[in-house]
């Protein structure tokens, strides 16, 4: 049964969802701080260097930032769950299934991007940059890395979050197609420019060596093509269902919010 709900009720629910999310982030940050040394050890593994800090409170501030970053990073599934809980009453049955699939796919790709960065890009990037060291008696001068703990954390954070966001591309494309069906034709028409954008993005986010750039750009192109293939399947499904009176393209964005 559909009926209109006052806007204040929606605002109250949004406020409640935000509070739940903040509670989860705070709890995750607190737990992360209890295991700050173990988490930092995992971050240190790709570089395998000793670290220094040059400010009296730098190590403490770095631990605090680490806890906040981990709390935000691990709260992404909870963030999606809160969005799901708010939107689900206004969804049709097939939209519930589609949105559930998009959420699960988004979470999987979110952590997949981090794993690719940690296990593939980080070793390649650090090996490249460590190659600028000048060690040994046969060198004209000596250059040795003395990594600062805070700068290393910020660098890792930027890389991990950048990759996690980039890997949301399929979810973004499918969502845009749901809102604006002509997105598919536009993506097909602009495919060459999108590929060029992927290579530019890979050059910005990854080290300048070709291997690391291809490690980043190949998944982006693969996800892009898979997204287009999925859209094509959805279009065929819609064209099959429309003759029998079913309107699969109807959107909850144009409907009235309901209760279950």
Swiss-Prot record:
The family this protein is said to belong to: Belongs to the TatC family.
**Which GO BP terms apply?**
intracellular protein transmembrane transport; protein transport by the Tat complex
* Superkingdom, natural source: Eukaryota
Q: Which organism is it from?
A: Reclinomonas americana
The record's GO CC annotations read:
mitochondrial membrane; TAT protein transport complex
Q: Where in the cell is it found?
A: Mitochondrion membrane
Give the source lineage, highest ranks first: Eukaryota, Discoba, Jakobida, Histionina, Histionidae
How is the protein disposed in the membrane?
Answer: Multi-pass membrane protein
What gene name is listed for this protein? Answer: YMF16
User: Keywords in UniProt for this one?
Assistant: Membrane, Mitochondrion, Transmembrane, Transmembrane helix
- The name of this protein is Uncharacterized tatC-like protein ymf16
A GO molecular function term, named singly, is:
proton motive force dependent protein transmembrane transporter activity
